Amino acid sequence: MTNNAAAPLYSLRGLPLIGWRDMSHALNYLFADGQLKQGTLVAINAEKLLTAEDNPEVRALIAAAEFKYADGISVVRSIRKKFPQAQVSRVAGADLWEALMARAGKEGTPVFFVGGKPEVLAQTEAKLRTQWNVNIVGSQDGYFTPEQRQALFARIHASGAKIVTVAMGSPKQELLMRDCREVHPHALYMGVGGTYDVFTGHVKRAPKIWQNLGLEWLYRLLSQPKRITRQMRLLRYLRWHYTGDL
């Protein structure tokens, strides 16, 4: 196994997080020696760590996921503070999803999509086929009942999908991925939140300069002032960070 196919783990609040150096390292890790890994990818930011701290069910879902990675700049900075020798960079979930789709298109990996509004999902599929020739073997928008879940899992299993991405928000997407894996275990699952909306232009992401400065959170706050209540929760995370309680 090549060095790029391995990655160190760094513990924050008792959760082991993968430390990728950059996007290339992430892709080489997930496609180690040409073999796509199986398991669940979960993006970890400060807000998700706070939720995991307060909600035992969410913590159990996150802890059970094989591939927890640093999606938020706050988490990256905390890893660097706690582990000064760590060579870890932020790998944003939306960027990782696009890179994963590009690689899947190149290799013909079968992909199944779950979640999103019907029109957004249709636009996502069309763009992925045009842009990277992604082998889409099935999809289901986010409008289905609990009674329809088992039928959906059966469809996913019958499709032979090797990648399943779920855009339902947390913790709904983590719950669905956990349950689907009982029916279709041999795949890589990824919770992607609002990524389909961003990919199709329905939601505007922060400009690159804001992302590069680690200020994407501030851009979202300025664009959506109603997020202030959620952002205030992060003061608790800052206390953890600056007191070394991570």
Curated annotation (Swiss-Prot):
Known pathway: Bacterial outer membrane biogenesis; enterobacterial common antigen biosynthesis
Keyword presence, RNA-binding: no
Keywords: Glycosyltransferase, Transferase
Reaction catalysed by this enzyme: UDP-N-acetyl-alpha-D-mannosaminouronate + N-acetyl-alpha-D-glucosaminyl-di-trans,octa-cis-undecaprenyl diphosphate = beta-D-ManNAcA-(1->4)-alpha-D-GlcNAc-di-trans,octa-cis-undecaprenyl diphosphate + UDP + H(+)
GO molecular function, one term: lipopolysaccharide N-acetylmannosaminouronosyltransferase activity
EC assignment: 2.4.1.180
Top-level taxon in the UniProt lineage: Bacteria
Entry similarity comment: Belongs to the glycosyltransferase 26 family.
NCBIfam families, per database record: PRK03692.1 (NF002980), wecG_tagA_cpsF (TIGR00696)
HAMAP family tied to this protein: WecG_RffM
Entry protein name: UDP-N-acetyl-D-mannosaminuronic acid transferase
